[in-house]
Amino acid sequence: MQVLRTPDERFEGLADWPFAPKYVQVKDADGTLLRIHHVDEGPRDGAPVLLMHGEPSWAYLYRHIIPRLVAAGHRAIAPDLVGFGRSDKPADRGDYTYARHVAWMSAWLEAVDLRGAYLFCQDWGGLIGLRLVAAYPERFAGVVVSNTGLPVGGGAMTDGFKAWLQFSQTVPELPIGFLLNGGSVRELSAAEMAAYDAPFPDESYKEGARQFPALVPVTSEHAGVAENQAAWKVLEAWDKPLVTAFSDGDPITKGGEVPFRERVPGARGQPHVTLHGGHFVQEDSPAEIAGLLDGLIRRSR
């Protein structure tokens, strides 16, 4: 497996990003070593909050949430998925599979040894993060699900996702910062959009971002359907808190909160919310997200 690594200087002087990088090496099934980046802020004895980003962002998406969690006494951990941020990037699009993403982040989770964690997941952060919850339920104390899902090939794609799938596979240059701006209600600054572009010096670094939309198991023929069905079985017995926090302006995941509220025992009686924002709700409602997580932790500890 050929692996690219974004030069460190691409991440120097980013707006609102004072956090020191931390790294874990994981081994792929083919023997390739991959370096995964994460941010780890706050007291070691604070409640660990795992903040998982999705397509095509990186941990920078949580820059306005991390300090709020730390100020509340919690520990904030935000990894970059393989192919994104400061994590290593396989150069061949075919090297990115749903199963591999789950395996890579499973190895990372075991290496950092999170226990009693509270997961906040959005977009592919949910498709991967919820699989981690299903595989390691003993490591998690609660979950907040936002603008994501755990698809099993049934139902129709939203028009928003169809358009995104078509665009992502055909556009000559994938405009990462532009996409983050378009998926947020507020207008991102030029510096913020540049920070989202930073992990990708050129198109060769974007194979993971190109591949993610095609990996979503929207049909029964997609890889990952059986594994997601098995994960749902675990979630259908999950009695720890699960809160939905979808946004009011995301055409891609509209209505996605319903199965979580209906099928997960731990979702009953929880203070589910609809947040103001687009697909990247972390950009639009960071204070509300941090407050929601703080409340969840204080209720359940």
From Swiss-Prot:
Gene responsible for this protein: dhmA
Protein name per UniProt: Haloalkane dehalogenase
Catalytic residues of the enzyme: 123 (nucleophile), 250 (proton donor), 279 (proton acceptor)
EC id: 3.8.1.5
Keywords: Hydrolase
Gene Ontology MF annotations: haloalkane dehalogenase activity
Pfam families according to UniProt: Abhydrolase_1
Family: Belongs to the haloalkane dehalogenase family. Type 1 subfamily.
Top enzyme class: hydrolase
Role according to the record: Catalyzes hydrolytic cleavage of carbon-halogen bonds in halogenated aliphatic compounds, leading to the formation of the corresponding primary alcohols, halide ions and protons.
NCBIfam families: PRK00870.1
Catalytic activity from the UniProt record: 1-haloalkane + H2O = a halide anion + a primary alcohol + H(+)
Quaternary assembly: Monomer.
